[in-house]
């Protein structure tokens, strides 16, 4: 039976695999459909994002977890000189 990974373990796994490809902090958001679950988000470098997502999702699958890993980006705002970031998101983590 597959299970969901907890937030502390997902941070350790991602930091061990990604190493220097992550910059900044990780963030935890409440899941929109289930308030008991969290989505963990990391800032990542764009050129490594897809490769990291595939590697992390494969690692979680092998370990028996069913969490989905996504890569998302924010739109760049030229006027405000902000945005344009790339994020690695691990959805549906158990708080822990």
Residues of each region from the PLM?
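An N-terminal amphipathic alpha-helical segment
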Residues: 1-44
